[in-house]
Amino acid sequence: MRRSRVLGAIAGALTLLTFSLEASAQGSADSDASWRRGTARRESDQTWAFELRFGPYRPNVDDEFEGGAAPYREVFGDSKRVFFGMELDWQALRIPWVGTFGPGVGWSYTSMSSKAKLSGTNVDSAEETSLWLMPMYAAGVLRVDVLPRELSIPLVPYGKLGLGYGLWKASNELGASEQGGVTGKGHSYGLHAAVGLALQLDFLDAAATQQLDNSVGINHAYGYLEWMWSDLGGFGGGQMKIGTSTWVTGLAFEI
């Protein structure tokens, strides 16, 4: 009988210890979950993406001429000019396990100037001639942000496809240039496409990222590198070819 009472006491103690350990583990898990909820990133609604864009630009003006003629190169040379621009995208649709898709519009500007050539020669004249270009586009934009959202890999590949439209004007010191009664200004349109890779910068300072979201609503910031192709020539309709193929870099912000 005494032995039975001892065994019963030991069994009761073991049962109580088991319940205590389970309660302690559950409390620790709840505490850990609460801590994680308290420190997790809280993001505001994300609807827009805005890009600042920079890169080299050399229009394909000479591509429309045959027989080796290259009027653009003869006046402005082979060097590329720098363009700057902006893009605004509406992230209208979120595709699960892929990213965002929606329409975007972009605008950019570049200009070049040089001494005009004396007629029929390669000799510079005293007259300055210049050309400015204003390419624009509307495109569908797909940003594949599943890597940073689900796997904590801060890389976002993306693609763009749409239509481009550009204004241009050639002028000299007297105003808009004119030849054969045709004023040196006009417009061109065509296809626009781009692919790129963006690096999400949140990992550099998570606290600053949260503060930026809280204060002005910027969810994420990116640096990016993009290859852009713009065929602005009227689909072969005789417009001046002011498009180009070039790389683009800059900063992007999701808002």
Feature map (PLM): residue ranges:
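Cleavable N-terminal export/targeting peptides
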Residues: M1-E43
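Short glycine/proline- and aromatic-enriched beta-strand/turn motifs that initiate or cap beta-hairpins
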Residues: A25-L93, G233-K241, A252-E254
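Short loop/turn motifs that connect adjacent beta-strands in outer-membrane beta-barrel proteins
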Residues: G27, A40-Q46, A92-F101, D145-L155, ...
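Residues that define the transmembrane beta-barrel architecture of outer-membrane proteins
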Residues: Q46-W48, D78-F84, S130-M136, L155, ...
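Transmembrane beta-strands of outer-membrane beta-barrel pores
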Residues: F54-N60, W107-S113, L142-V144, L163-S171, ...
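Extracellular/periplasm-exposed beta-strand and loop segments of Gram-negative cell-envelope proteins
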Residues: N60-R81, S108-P135, L167-S188, G236-K241
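Gram-negative (and chloroplast) outer-membrane scaffold detector with strong preference
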Residues: F84-E173
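Predominantly the C-terminal beta-signal and adjacent terminal strand-loop region
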Residues: G196-I255
